[in-house]
Amino acid sequence: MPGRARTRARGRARRRESYQQEAPGGPRAPGSATTQEPPQLQSTPRPLQEEVPVVRPLQPRAARGGAGGGAQSQGVKEPGPEAGLHTAPLQERRIGGVFQDLVVNTRQDMKHVKDSKTGSEGTVVQLLANHFRVISRPQWVAYKYNVDYKPDIEDGNLRTILLDQHRRKFGERHIFDGNSLLLSRPLKERRVEWLSTTKDKNIVKITVEFSKELTPTSPDCLRYYNILFRRTFKLLDFEQVGRNYYTKKKAIQLYRHGTSLEIWLGYVTSVLQYENSITLCADVSHKLLRIETAYDFIKRTSAQAQTGNIREEVTNKLIGSIVLTKYNNKTYRVDDIDWKQNPEDTFNKSDGSKITYIDYYRQQHKEIVTVKKQPLLVSQGRWKKGLTGTQREPILLIPQLCHMTGLTDEICKDYSIVKELAKHTRLSPRRRHHTLKEFINTLQDNKKVRELLQLWDLKFDTNFLSVPGRVLKNANIVQGRRMVKANSQGDWSREIRELPLLNAMPLHSWLILYSRSSHREAMSLKGHLQSVTAPMGITMKPAEMIEVDGDANSYIDTLRKYTRPTLQMGMSCLLVFKVICILPNDDKRRYDSIKRYLCTKCPIPSQCVVKKTLEKVQARTIVTKIAQQMNCKMGGALWKVETDVQRTMFVGIDCFHDIVNRQKSIAGFVASTNAELTKWYSQCVIQKTGEELVKELEICLKAALDVWCKNESSMPHSVIVYRDGVGDGQLQALLDHEAKKMSTYLKTISPNNFTLAFIVVKKRINTRFFLKHGSNFQNPPPGTVIDVELTRNEWYDFFIVSQSVQDGTVTPTHYNVIYDTIGLSPDTVQRLTYCLCHMYYNLPGIIRVPAPCHYAHKLAYLVGQSIHQEPNRSLSTRLFYL
């Protein structure tokens, strides 16, 4: 099946009581929630997050009110008795995201790396990183003040406007994040109260209370520097879209399939403390916009609808899309369409009066709604950590004012336009280096930017940071009776083309199901399989060819018919049948139904392939991959790598959060169950929406250890866990609730015999490395390790560039060993990690993360996207999700 983009939302809870009471379940109008930005064309990691000034700006609500006539945007009620003298201390707002992780010192408990965490293996190379050293920073203590509003103001812009009325009292040298104020000099009093006036003459009391002093290098102070730096984008006329800033000045326009596309150039930045210095990390980001409103999309889809139920077809295509509202540059995910309401309907304002959506947008945003009879889009906003159990209030949007983002299915299937988009967004190392150099020079040359940074004595080096790296040797790969290595591109497909598999499984009782239109492709598949399996060592009997109607039910009914006798005899279908389904197209509902049946009710190793895939010129190569996948799903193995460790179980954990359909979150757990790393145990844990920490790890680990003991007749000595899918700010919780709990459980089994290492894997990072050759820049070769300069003294961490990319700039992966009772040396853990990147059976090449991590991702994704329930346990020892 075609790749389906993985989506993930991570947010931070913010608890603050509003002066208005929410109506239970009442939908609200647009602009009132922090939202997930749409997937970007170029895979860019999440930017460093400062505490944003606002979580839910005050906006009109459809079942009650919220809009007033505030300063520039909306107003507030007159303060009542509750706005009297406020004597209780203001609540300290916690720092969020990555800044929480910076204060977690995990290295201090690992004595074996107390003096040094730097390895020595490999060939030394000199690299450049997209980091720029801070060469000047404040040397004075800064003063943090908490800021509170009565009545509470949720709109970040309005909070800033009201505070700015008193700017002469605290001066130009200040940084405000919406909740707290950082000053270079203290106020005369620890606590002050100021009165501000909104545009409609309402009075708001602002209480400013001293919180603490901050040293220039404290994580909280660094957070303010990031907020300050983001101000520079506004001075450069960049527009904020989601969390990042983009410019329209260099927009690239394309037109395909009746849709105009626009690519905006932007940047992701962060200022953080590393081993020897504070640096500014800057990377290029792109935002893809369709010059098409949601209303245009609804009209076009309605005109092209092929079914009688036009509304259902429009809803199915629009749900899950990301739209941009240009009046506030926010992005929203469409969760539903309210066909019963239109812009002429009314909602209640905060003063109890009613206003239509048309009038609201004209008054508040100067937007004119010309189409009266259009439905309203419904967005549920974004769930936040700590508040996943609370009911979210829907946000209502007008389609005419919502601009579509991302790519349509028609565009995605057009190779020429995808290639054209990649040309503009997948920047080569040379182009990326040049673009970033231009950006840094622009900052340096802009007078307003210089003046802003000089207020805080901040100055950045304009040269890319130079860092040493080491290139490790590729792992020894054993297949058949031969040992091979990956080539310079991290691939060994040529080297193993005619070699037998390490452990080939016979293919005897198997079925090929196909629709009438796919008969030719089915016969071709059968013939190719017979020719490609012999060199692999797979013995194969002729398949039973079964023609079906092509809909999901016809596939399932046929499978039920063929498996019923086996089930009635009390036998497992897993031992009898293997299935290949040729699908007429890539309809997701058909695929999901078939996979759900074959992974839950009737567990059978299965492979689904779209007819169009078998029509390609390289059909034989594709069939070879199908045969290899089927071999793995039946319990076989393609190759193994030499790890030089004894009796060690490797575990991968990853989480999938289905934020499109608001389904449960899925944690995938995959563990090796033999010493050669060729057998695996897989289990998933279904959790609450947005939950990242896995609660049932002990159960998963026990089951995996039981399978290991069955395969090896004894327990492993060590367990090494690679944990992916963790958001910023979760490091301490991960250490307490997963790493230490697993260690405690292992001690209950055998207090002295088990050792554990727990490694956090992070793919979504902004750091890039360049290898310079003369005046040119290239990607570092696979196996490049960086464990100095851009690592942290408090962590046992390192980067590895494990994969090779044909287009664009390679993204390294960051590893952080947060718990280790094994005593892994830097060279050992780096070499092991790189070796495991050779063990993903879907590709004869090196991948970006260790194989157990990627297996866990594939498992969680299949369950979260297609199955939506726990797979049958009889499949747990098979890689059925490849």
UniProtKB/Swiss-Prot annotation:
Organs and tissues of expression: Expressed in testis.
Keyword set for this entry? Cytoplasm, Developmental protein, Differentiation, Meiosis, RNA-binding, RNA-mediated gene silencing, Spermatogenesis, Translation regulation
Q: Name one GO biological process term.
A: piRNA processing
Name any one GO molecular function: piRNA binding
For whether the record's keyword set contains Cytoplasm, the answer is yes
Where it sits in the cell: the answer is:
Cytoplasm
Which domain of life does the protein's organism represent?
Eukaryota
Q: What is its main location?
A: cytoplasm
Chain positions covered by the region annotation Disordered = 1-91
- Compositional bias of type Basic residues: which residue ranges? 1-15
Piwi domain location is 578-868
One Pfam family cited in the UniProt record for this chain? Piwi
Which parts of the sequence belong to the PAZ domain?
293-406
Q: Per the record, where are the segments of Polar residues compositional bias?
A: 32-46
Which InterPro entries would you find in this protein's record? PAZ_dom, PAZ_dom_sf, Piwi, RNaseH-like_sf, RNaseH_sf
Instruction: Extract one GO cellular component term from the record.
Output: nucleus
Q: What does this protein do?
A: May play a role during spermatogenesis by repressing transposable elements and preventing their mobilization, which is essential for the germline integrity. Acts via the piRNA metabolic process, which mediates the repression of transposable elements during meiosis by forming complexes composed of piRNAs and Piwi proteins and govern the methylation and subsequent repression of transposons. Directly binds piRNAs, a class of 24 to 30 nucleotide RNAs that are generated by a Dicer-independent mechanism and are primarily derived from transposons and other repeated sequence elements.
Similarity comment = Belongs to the argonaute family. Piwi subfamily.
Q: What is this protein called?
A: Piwi-like protein 3
The organism encoding this protein is: Homo sapiens
Write the lineage as a comma-separated list.
Answer: Eukaryota, Metazoa, Chordata, Craniata, Vertebrata
Q: Its gene?
A: PIWIL3
